A protein has these predicted regions:
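FAD-binding core/adjacent interface of flavoenzyme oxidoreductases
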Residues: 1-11, 78-163
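Beta1-alpha1 glycine-rich phosphate/pyrophosphate-binding loop at the start
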Residues: 2-79, 85, 172-211
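Rossmann-like NAD(P)H-binding beta-loop-alpha module
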Residues: 141-195
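Rossmann-fold NAD(P)H-dependent dehydrogenase/reductase core
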Residues: 215-222
Length: 222
């Protein structure tokens, strides 16, 4: 099945794959143009405000507070939910995972990035990434389940140490939020909460390496 959204009006068909910050910024600017029709494709029907994922991961914010429906916010953009399985640049078509084909005149790929493991054995299998709502949900479940299991004697006290790799803004924010969560659970887990710790690892000489050194010093002290 071939879908050509702009065929009847003669408009240029611009397809954007990825509804992250980059894809949505393009869609917002292009939709103001009367000379093109914009189609936005993403596997999720919502815009994710990823800088606040750490708050979802530590039960500080509900998921709905950082996920905004794309169809509601961008009514002038044709939204297609799904995943692209193939791109034919000669025919200028995209094939979706459900078998449907979408034609385009111009294609913008804004699919984002994946967490880097740097080829370190065991990273993918034994750590949590934090790139999506599902990742944040998994972290939250694991944290709360670990507290319960240590309290019940199923897991040893050593499992209360949360290790965060990466001393950039996300790592620092997550470390602070986990520390706050550990303080908040003291009433429910008064016997084990004092044993809970957070370890933040950074390969470079200081935290927040992209920030001013004074910010790094302040962060490290606090």
């Amino acid at each position: 099945m071939l879908i050509e959204f702009g065929e009847q009006s003669g408009e240029k068909q611009v397809v954007i794959v990825g509804a992250g910050f980059g894809g949505l910024a393009c869609a917002k600017k292009l939709r103001k143009s009367r000379s093109c029709r914009v189609t936005l494709i993403d596997r999720n029907p919502y815009q994710l405000f990823s800088p606040l994922l750490y708050q979802v991961a530590t039960a500080s914010l509900p998921e709905d507070d950082i996920a905004f429906p794309i169809r509601t916010a961008y009514r002038e953009v044709q939204f297609v939910r799904g995943e692209v399985s193939n791109i034919d640049t000669t025919a200028k078509t995209l094939t979706m995972s459900n078998g449907k084909t979408i034609s385009y005149d111009d294609l913008i790929l804004a699919v984002g990035s994946e967490g880097a493991t740097y080829g370190i054995p065991g990273v993918s299998e034994n750590t949590f990434q934090m790139k999506s709502v599902h990742d944040a949900r998994d972290i939250r479940r694991s944290l709360l389940r670990t507290y319960e299991d240590v309290e019940d004697g199923i897991l040893p006290l050593e499992r209360l140490n949360v290790v965060i790799v990466g001393g950039g803004p996300t790592g620092v924010e997550l470390a602070g939020a986990v520390s706050e969560l550990q303080r908040e659970i003291q009433r429910e887990f008064e016997h084990i909460a004092p044993k809970a710790t957070v370890t933040l690892l950074e390969a470079g000489p200081r935290l927040l390496p992209s920030f001013h050194p004074n910010s790094s010093k302040y962060t490290q002290k606090n």
